[in-house]
Amino acid sequence: MLIGHFTEQPWQDDNSGLMGTQSTDLSISNEHYNPNVGAHLYNRYLDEKVYAEEMGFDALMLNEHHSTPFCMQGVTNVGASILARITNKAKIIILGNVLPIWDDPLWLAEQLAMIDMISHGRLVSGFVRGGGRESYAHNSPPHFNRERFEEAHDFIIKAWSDPGPFRWEGKHYHYRYVNPWARPLQQPHPPIWIPSTVSVETVKWTAAHRYPLVLLATKLEPTKEAFQLYHDTAAELGYESGTQNVAYLWKVHVDETEEKAEEVGRKYLSGVSNPFLAGNEGQVNPAIMNLPGHTSVSYTHLTLPTKA
């Protein structure tokens, strides 16, 4: 079993007056942002990752979101590249780069290859489709989200694995000359993980590629169903999957004593900081999260409505 350290790296500033805000996506002006506080938080979160490695965590996990204070990391590759240099043992797991918003996946392939080399082969590269927030904020057409995800994935794998130069003429990406000088240390490429929240298509696609499926704080019963769908798909494709093929993001609060941890944890679950309470839209306005064309009819929104 691999245990990793993960946090959304949220904005924290009591003077911002954002506690209890109904929605934290695209509706809060960045006039509330204080660069001095931001500078402190970015360095603090990096220090936490270094400490997590010292405490024995197997992996340091990073993600990215855009135009929202609940996740300060808008460019996950920046944090990953810093950790590649200042840590020594732990895997660096990106959960993950939002492929559909990248207009230049060759540039992404080069960045990730550099991170893998600087870390001496510790990179695990996660790829995600992203939510409606990312498409909305970066002017990416939601109805082509899955197509762009799959084509960008195929291109990056080829750029990492096949000798160049070669030409790429796809539906969404076109290159006259592909010959990245930066190639990953791990050959033919770093491990790929696929985080999801979850859709039938994504589960089956992930199983078909034999990538680990990472479910992000989804309800337990649908999580079991999704994992079983993965295992069933693997069996249909002729291989036996196991615990090495699935992962789960679990929320944990640690404090000085068990009693204090439970007290603070319950305040989080039942207080204004819980984005899923009745009358609260949550981190994402549903109208933005589920943009037309972004999700299929098979999609079930499984993000955990946490209860005390």
Per-segment meaning from a language model:
Residues 1-87, 190, 301:
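N-terminal beta1-alpha1-beta2 module of alpha/beta enzyme domains
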Residues 3-5, 60-62, 92-94, 123-125, ...:
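Hydrophobic faces of well-ordered beta-strands that scaffold small-molecule active sites
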Residues 82-88, 116-122, 207-208, 238-239:
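Acidic (Asp/Glu)-rich catalytic clusters
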Residues 300-306:
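Conserved small/polar residues in nucleotide/adenosyl-binding loops
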Residues 74, 78, 221-226:
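Active-site-adjacent beta->alpha loops and helix N-cap segments on the catalytic face
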Residues 201-207, 226, 243-283:
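Aromatic-lined glycan-binding groove of carbohydrate-active enzymes
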Residues 83, 115, 156, 192, ...:
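Conserved, mostly hydrophobic/aromatic
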Residues 2-38, 101-167, 212-215, 219-221, ...:
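Flexible, glycine-rich active-site loops centered on histidine and acidic residues
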